[in-house]
Amino acid sequence: MAVININEVITHLLPGQTIAGLDLGKKTIGIAVSDRGLTFSNPRSVLQRKKLTVDARTLIQIFDRENVGVVIIGLPLNMNGSSGPRAQATRTFVNNMEAYTEIPFVFWDERLSTIAAERSLLEMDVSRAKRATRIDSAAAAFILQGALNRIQNLHYMEG
């Protein structure tokens, strides 16, 4: 597995493969998966974190089931663009995943993604209890949708 740049994503996908989005938290991992056309992000489950080996095995099962070729993972930068402890924890998680999968990862700036996801759930009138269980997968979908939009723009610009 390698960490790749957003402009390399298309070259790493086989026909029919999807892209996964992850929102890595201390206790949970929000998961989203694109459609096969790489246009829409769809929230999936929220994984309750246990330990790396268990989390990695569960993620790989999801990636296999969803035919994932690339993973976009939110990088929680500080508002000034600097890296803090959460960004370092995300980088460490991706480095540790190298032992479990060959699927490449892309870091994606996730600043304000959770706020945007919560606002979206509020607009859909989702109850507080349901918001708490859905916020991480909604944030993953928001992260993934931003990356998908960028991929579409790159593809459009290339002709």
Curated annotation (Swiss-Prot):
GO biological process terms, semicolon-separated: rRNA 5'-end processing
Gene Ontology CC: one annotated term: cytosol
Superkingdom field: Bacteria
SUPFAM superfamilies per UniProt: Ribonuclease H-like
Gene3D superfamilies, per database record: YqgF/RNase H-like domain
Compartments, record wording: Cytoplasm
EC number(s) recorded for this UniProt protein: 3.1.-.-
UniProt-recorded Gene Ontology molecular function terms: nuclease activity
Enzyme class: hydrolase
HAMAP family: Nuclease_YqgF (MF_00651)
Family membership noted in the UniProt record: Belongs to the YqgF nuclease family.
Protein's job: Could be a nuclease involved in processing of the 5'-end of pre-16S rRNA.
Protein's name in the database: Putative pre-16S rRNA nuclease
Organism (species): Bartonella quintana (strain Toulouse)
